[in-house]
Design a protein with these regions (language model features):
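Interdomain helical connector at the RecA1-RecA2 junction of SF1/SF2 helicase-like NTPases
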Residues: 291-406
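ATP-dependent helicase/translocase motor core
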Residues: 1-176, 181, 185-200, 215-219, ...
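Conserved C-terminal RecA-like helicase domain
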Residues: 218, 369-474
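Conserved ATPase-coupling elements of RecA-like P-loop NTPase cores
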Residues: 190, 230-234, 257-267, 290, ...
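Long, largely alpha-helical accessory region at the distal end of helicase-like NTP-driven motors
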Residues: 112-116, 375-379, 389, 529-549
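Conserved helix-turn-beta segment of the N-terminal RecA-like "Helicase ATP-binding" lobe
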Residues: 184-208, 424-433
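SF2 helicase catalytic motif II
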Residues: 240-279, 283
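Conserved RecA-like P-loop NTPase helicase motor core
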Residues: 53, 225-226, 251, 444-546
Length: 549
């Protein structure tokens, strides 16, 4: 559990605070063959998971080994021939090209920050993998571009904080570092984490009295909107160019780099060509190839790989759940009976459909096709009876699995759809309270969209206690990055074709919350989105047959 292994074998350099793991040693019973269980696939997996180069197994008399670089297994060998510390140090240097005694390698041996001193094994492995690439890029005279693929909820911001701290301690931050994200909520979360490490030397980039409030800080935290990276073409990067010279940063970390890095905010990378560029993503590289995978997903993945290279370290949702760091996911597949049929244009009119974008009743002139199927519902057409049926079934499921007063996100197709879903769920909740002789709590279900007075202010109480703000009905405001540890359920009333979006949305429920005993979350799928799961994931749990509400 939790990624533990029998032993980690480390290289130690005198007068440095931290050791460098280079191998895993599996201890076996004396009576067992030391090569038992040392399949090639397992060797590769152990090396990847711990970012080590070798795997050894021994029964105390003989040993076997797996070498990541050659892909070969060896043994059994007599135990007296087992490599000692100088042997492993020399072998690591020869295979990686990194001499651990040089100043360039110092970052590998720096301790984590006092704010986050006990990294989880995969967080430490991710930082080591990033540093190894940075060291080798610098040796070649290349700019270091590093990609880390970490499951949502695995602590990407803590990884960033400790990575920057270790660079700082190794005197590798000659100029400030920039942490760049695309939403205010992510900026505030990053600021909280980075301030815990760097204190007042971590500042949010904003205008104050006509000046950059972060100008004297070591760590600058910004959204690309603040830097002016979403300006019109003639004013691209207005704040960036006004307040920052070229090559102003020594390190740039781009959070959720799969979302927008290839739009205008790539300007910040171009203006800092000599900085270390680090991309953080929660999107798994291996997505199921299917007709549902969108052209946009293909382009995003290709762009990430082209710019950053392959991820130097990957920590998947499955691995995090197996390790016990993220909540398990219980899938409930539902499908409204209305979705099994195809509607003629006459039936659409008879059902009282409304325009999903404007809310006005559909007329015959609006219907350009002879037939309409489920994916058209709620994105283009909204059938009031369908919304009512789905909300009724969801409320019944919530009552059955923990009660209605639990924290839930419902992903809807459009804003009007979110409005109608919130209204239906509120009505159902009021009726439930009346039947139970209970006083309804405030803001049970609410629309949560971007913009002022449009529900975004309810994110704080949604995160908070169980006294109000239970069900957030949104389109995509909460799809990524916002930490809601109390979240008990993620609901899809929305049709999706993008695995990237699906994984982001799913990740909202994956955090464990020990205070309420939350170690799993529910995924209610009303639109077949779980078909976007990677094949390795959908083997656990078994796929239930869909029920018809």
């Amino acid at each position: 559990g939790k990624g533990r292994t029998d032993y980690l074998l480390c290289v130690k350099v005198e007068a440095v605070p931290k050791s460098l793991p280079v191998a895993v040693l599996e201890a076996k019973r004396e009576s067992e063959d030391p090569l038992k269980g040392m399949q090639q696939a397992k060797g590769y997996a152990d090396c990847r998971r711990h970012d080590v180069k070798y795997v050894f197994a021994t029964n105390g008399h003989r040993y076997g080994e797996f070498d990541k670089f050659t892909g070969l297994q060896g043994g059994p060998f007599p135990f007296p021939d087992f490599p000692n510390h100088p042997d492993l140090t020399a072998r690591y240097a020869g295979d990686t090209g990194i001499d651990v005694h040089t100043p360039e390698a110092a970052i590998l041996f720096m301790a984590d920050s006092p704010a986050y001193p006990e990294s989880r094994y995969y967080q430490d492995a991710a930082i080591r993998a990033a540093f190894e690439k940075i060291i080798n890029c610098r040796k070649r005279g290349d700019t270091a571009h590093v990609l880390l693929s970490m499951a949502t909820g695995s602590g990407k911001t803590i990884i960033a904080a400790n990575l920057l701290w270790r660079l700082h301690e190794a005197e590798c931050l000659p100029t400030p570092a920039l942490f760049l994200c695309d939403r205010d909520e992510l900026r505030e979360q990053a600021y909280t984490r980075l301030k815990a490490v760097f204190g007042d030397n971590a500042r949010i980039v904003e205008t104050r009295n006509g000046k950059n409030a972060a100008q004297n800080a070591r760590i600058h935290i910004a959204t690309y909107q603040t830097l002016g990276l979403d300006d019109e073409a003639e004013e691209v990067a207005s704040f960036l160019t006004k307040h920052y010279a070229e090559d102003a940063f020594s390190v740039i970390i781009i959070d959720e780099c799969h979302r927008s890095a290839w739009g205008k905010w790539s300007e910040v990378l171009k203006r800092n060509p000599n900085a270390i560029h680090i991309g953080l993503t929660a999107t798994p590289r291996q997505l199921r190839e299917s007709k549902q995978r969108t052209a946009e997903d293909v382009e995003i993945t290709a762009n990430n790989i082209k710019y950053f290279g392959d991820p130097v370290y990957e920590y998947t949702l499955i691995q995090a759940q197996e390790d016990g760091y993220l909540a398990a996911c219980e899938i409930v597949r539902r499908k409204p009976s209305i979705d099994w049929k195809t509607f003629t244009s006459e039936q659409v009119l008879a059902a009282g459909a409304v325009d999903a974008r404007t809310g006005r009743p559909i007329t015959a002139e609006d219907l350009t096709k002879d037939e309409y199927s489920a994916p058209s519902f709620d994105d283009k057409l909204m059938l009031p009876e369908r919304v009512k049926a789905m909300c009724g079934d969801l409320f019944e499921q919530l009552c059955k699995n923990g009660g209605p007063e639990q924290k839930v996100i419902v992903f809807c197709n459009r804003e009007i759809h979110a409005d109608r879903v919130a209204m239906q769920l509120n009505n159902l909740y009021v009726k439930w309270c009346r039947e139970k002789d209970r006083t309804p709590k405030e803001h049970y279900a609410f629309k949560c969209m971007g913009g002022k007075n449009n529900g975004a202010d309810m994110i704080v109480p949604l995160r908070g206690s169980g006294q109000r703000a239970f069900v957030a009905c949104t389109v995509d405001l909460l799809e990524a990055g916002v930490d809601i540890e109390r979240l008990n359920a993620v609901v899809f009333f929305r049709y999706l074709q993008s695995p990237i979006k699906f994984y982001q949305m799913l990740g909202r429920g994956s955090r464990i919350y020990e205070e309420t005993g939350k170690y799993k979350f529910w995924l209610y799928d009303y639109t077949g989105v779980t078909e976007l799961f990677g094949t390795d994931f959908i083997t656990r749990p078994p796929r239930p047959k869909p029920d018809k509400p």
